[in-house]
């Protein structure tokens, strides 16, 4: 019962596996119909690979199963192999099974055998048709028919692949005496000679390339020397090579900083050194390639000819009788197996002991011949490896030298050109040359030299009291011959009375007339009219300045001046009287210092609030103070030289004067008049 149960379970497993395989086959067939003919080959190959995997799995399952029922007769004429020697044998195996074997899409899954699974091409397989009365058989027959030609072809190809794989595995078994792992009919010397001939061609190509490189390096030397000669700056110095000789070049050279200061004058030296260094490096590279690298490669190429001849001379070492010895070993193996079979099943014709001794002796002889051949291969391969190692190392050494030379040339660009320019001319400010040129050349101003102002100027006797103006303003002077008056701007200084056309001391610098006070006196002035208003004009605003006789030609003359007010006239009269009557210079200094409120050094004193300055301040660079004719106030505000008052042009007034009143000396006094607004003067009636 247990045996039947085991067999039933095995059959059920096979049936389930068969159904899965049939379903998979059906899906594959549908997929194949839907694909184009171009994709059929690829899909078929993938299906075969999947079928092989499924075939191996099912073989494992079938080999573990044992069938006792059913009728499947297979006459197998199998030629078995014992230790690699084919032994003809005939065996009839009868398998009883009530189920047919399953054929999947890849072919026959496997043949169940109780013996060796190896089946050669002489194996005849007969598959019995299932019993028609068997329902299960009918069902399986409907699902998977053996009449399908594609399935049968796949089965045959699968069996052939299995057989070839097993044979290759046996042939590569190092324990089998019927296998020779060493090639017996090979020609390794010819192959190796051809390989080193190819290496000779490679070396020749490298030699041609390096020869052209050497030629190019020679051309680089010529081109770099041309570039070195093209560096021509006639007014720049080149270190250790060139100095300007002409006076013009030397003068132009002074426009730039000297050599070594990072200026543009360093450029010729850097470029010249760069091109000369490249020319020297290219010349060195050409010499090294021509005299060292290329000759070594040529010697190696000539040596390879000798080595190739030596390799070809070793061809006799590979002549062997391994195939002959292998046949004798097979014959001895066959005799040994037959003697052993006869000793087991029938009357022995030969003693297995003796046949085994003969077999072992033949195997040793075969191995000796095989080892001789093996040593020849080892010797050839070792020598070839060493020779090729030398070839490769020489080529590597040559290309390494070439790469080093190129690297040195590339490094020169950085070391001599880029680094020097980067640390020098590239790194300076664009105005570096200009600033140094301006600072060194005496024909230009320093960039940081400020402009001077007039108030910063100091010179000797700058604040001498004799340089100040005492009073200035508009007066009217009567003509010598006519009774008319002409208006002018008068400036009273310690020594002169000057008449100007205008009050602008920037444009009008030359006086129309100048009267020396040392040659003049003030004689009289008009009396103040008590009945007139404070602002009245006329006979009460006149004074006479008498010019003394100077020699025979020049006679004395009375100059009649008219002011716009009595107070202004008295101020002019008093100042003129003191200045004309004072002959001592010290007294004159004292008067000026007190009147203009000057310090001991001659500078005007500041007021208490430090906001206003005496209007009689120094007149620097021949400029004078500007003051209205009404303004005689000592403490009035100072008017700078840059301010030009807007005054009227010369005004002529027709005024007649019959007589001048006597001068009242008691009315002369130093006073500080007020500032008045100038108004038109009415006609004076005598």
Curated annotation (Swiss-Prot):
GO cellular component, one term: plasma membrane
Post-translational modification comment from the UniProt entry: Phosphorylated by the target of rapamycin complex 2 (TORC2) and dephosphorylated by serine/threonine-protein phosphatase 2B (calcineurin). Dephosphorylated in response to the disruption or inhibition of sphingolipid synthesis.
Gene Ontology terms: biological process: actin cytoskeleton organization; actin filament bundle assembly; eisosome assembly; endosomal transport; establishment or maintenance of actin cytoskeleton polarity; protein localization to plasma membrane; regulation of cell growth; TOR signaling
Annotated positions of the Phosphoserine modification: 145, 150, 153
Topology in membrane: Peripheral membrane protein
Domain PH, chain residue ranges per copy: 468-581
Coiled coil regions, renumbered to chain: 296-381
Motif (PXIXIT-like, required for interaction with CNA1 and CNA2, and calcineurin-dependent dephosphorylation): 673-678
Subcellular location: Cell membrane
PROSITE patterns, A to Z: PH_DOMAIN
GO molecular function: identical protein binding; phosphatidylinositol-4,5-bisphosphate binding; sphingolipid binding
Superkingdom assignment: Eukaryota
SMART domains: PH
Annotated segments matching region Disordered: 33-147, 157-176, 626-669
Residue ranges with Low complexity bias: 45-63, 133-144, 157-172
Effect of residue 487 to A: In SLM1-PHM1; reduces phosphoinositide binding by 80% and causes mislocalization to the cytoplasm. In SLM1-PHM2; reduces phosphoinositide binding by 95%
Bias (Polar residues): 64-126, 634-663
UniProt keywords, alphabetically: Cell membrane, Coiled coil, Lipid metabolism, Membrane, Phosphoprotein, Sphingolipid metabolism
Function: Together with SLM2, acts as an effector of the TORC2- and calcineurin-signaling pathways. Phosphorylated and activated by TORC2 under favorable growth conditions. Mediates actin polarization via inhibition of calcineurin-dependent transcription. Upon nutrient limitation or environmental stress, gets dephosphorylated by calcineurin. Dephosphorylation inhibits its interaction with TORC2, thereby antagonizing TORC2 signaling and mediating calcineurin-dependent actin depolarization.
PANTHER family found in the cross-reference section: CYTOSKELETAL SIGNALING PROTEIN SLM1 (PTHR31941), PHOSPHATIDYLINOSITOL 4,5-BISPHOSPHATE-BINDING PROTEIN SLM1-RELATED (PTHR31941:SF16)
More about this protein: Present with 5190 molecules/cell in log phase SD medium.
Subunit structure as annotated in this protein's UniProt entry: Heterodimer of SLM1-SLM2. Binds phosphatidylinositol 4,5-bisphosphate, which is required for function. Interacts with the TORC2 subunits AVO2, BIT61 and TOR2. Interacts with the calcineurin catalytic subunits CNA1 and CNA2.
The protein's name: Phosphatidylinositol 4,5-bisphosphate-binding protein SLM1
Species: Saccharomyces cerevisiae (strain ATCC 204508 / S288c)
């Amino acid at each position: 019962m247990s045996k039947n149960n085991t067999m039933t379970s095995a059959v059920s497993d096979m049936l389930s596996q068969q159904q899965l395989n049939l379903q998979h086959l059906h899906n594959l067939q549908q997929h194949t119909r839907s694909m184009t003919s171009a994709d059929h080959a690829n899909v078929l190959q993938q299906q075969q690979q999947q079928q092989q995997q499924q075939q191996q799995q099912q073989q494992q399952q079938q080999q573990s199963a044992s069938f006792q029922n059913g009728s499947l007769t297979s006459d197998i004429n199998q030629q078995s192999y014992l230790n690699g020697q084919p032994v003809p044998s005939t065996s009839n195996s009868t398998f009883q099974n009530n189920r047919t074997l399953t054929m999947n899409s890849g072919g026959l899954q496997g043949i169940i055998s109780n013996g060796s699974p190896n089946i050669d091409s002489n194996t005849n397989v007969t598959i019995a048709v299932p019993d028609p009365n068997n329902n299960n058989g009918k069902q399986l027959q409907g699902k998977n028919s053996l009449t399908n030609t594609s399935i049968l072809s796949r089965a045959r190809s699968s069996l052939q692949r299995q057989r070839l794989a097993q044979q290759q595995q046996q042939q590569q078994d190092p324990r089998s005496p019927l296998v020779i792992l060493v090639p017996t009919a090979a020609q390794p010397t010819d192959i190796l000679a051809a390989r080193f001939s190819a290496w000779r061609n490679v070396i020749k190509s490298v030699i041609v390339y390096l020869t052209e490189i050497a030629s190019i390096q020679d051309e680089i030397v010529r081109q770099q020397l041309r570039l070195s000669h093209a560096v021509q700056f006639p007014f720049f110095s080149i270190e250790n090579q060139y100095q300007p000789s002409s006076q013009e070049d030397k003068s132009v050279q002074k426009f730039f900083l000297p050599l070594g200061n990072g200026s543009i004058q360093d450029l010729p030296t850097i470029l010249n050194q760069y091109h000369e260094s490249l020319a020297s490096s290219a010349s060195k590279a050409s010499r090294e390639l021509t005299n060292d690298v290329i000759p070594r490669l040529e010697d190696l190429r000539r040596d390879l000819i000798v080595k190739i001849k030596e390799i070809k001379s070793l061809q006799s070492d590979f002549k062997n009788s391994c195939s002959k010895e292998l046949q004798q070993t097979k014959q001895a193996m066959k005799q040994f197996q037959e003697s052993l079979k006869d000793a087991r099943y029938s009357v022995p014709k030969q003693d297995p002991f003796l046949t085994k001794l003969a077999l072992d002796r033949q195997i040793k002889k075969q191995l000796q011949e095989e080892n001789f051949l093996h040593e020849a291969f080892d010797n050839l391969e070792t020598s070839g490896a060493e020779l090729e190692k030398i070839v490769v190392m020489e080529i590597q050494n040559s290309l390494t030298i070439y790469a080093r030379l190129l690297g040195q040339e590339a490094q020169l660009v950085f070391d001599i050109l880029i680094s020097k320019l980067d640390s020098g001319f590239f790194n300076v400010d664009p105005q570096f040359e200009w600033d140094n040129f301006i600072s060194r050349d005496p024909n230009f101003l320093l960039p940081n030299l400020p402009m001077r102002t007039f108030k910063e100027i100091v010179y000797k006797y700058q604040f001498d009291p004799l340089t100040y103006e005492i009073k200035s303003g508009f007066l009217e002077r009567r003509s010598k011959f006519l009774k008319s008056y002409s208006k002018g701007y008068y400036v009273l200084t310690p020594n002169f009375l000057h008449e100007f056309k205008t009050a602008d001391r920037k444009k009008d610098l030359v006086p129309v007339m100048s009267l020396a006070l040392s040659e003049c006196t003030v004689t009289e002035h008009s009396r103040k009219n008590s009945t007139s208003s404070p602002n009245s004009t006329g006979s009460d605003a006149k004074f006479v300045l008498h010019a003394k006789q100077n020699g025979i030609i020049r006679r004395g003359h009375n100059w009649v001046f008219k002011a716009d007010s009595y107070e202004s006239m008295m101020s002019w009269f008093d100042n003129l009287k003191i200045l004309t009557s004072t002959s001592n210079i010290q007294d004159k200094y004292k008067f000026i210092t007190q009147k203009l409120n000057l310090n001991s050094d001659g500078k005007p004193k500041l007021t208490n609030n430090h906001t206003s300055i005496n209007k009689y301040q120094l007149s620097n660079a021949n400029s004078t103070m500007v003051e209205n004719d009404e303004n005689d106030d000592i403490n009035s505000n100072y008017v700078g030289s840059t301010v030009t008052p807007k005054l009227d042009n010369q005004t002529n007034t027709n005024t007649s004067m019959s007589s001048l009143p006597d001068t009242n000396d008691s009315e002369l006094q130093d006073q500080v008049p007020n500032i008045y607004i100038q108004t038109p003067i009415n006609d004076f009636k005598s």
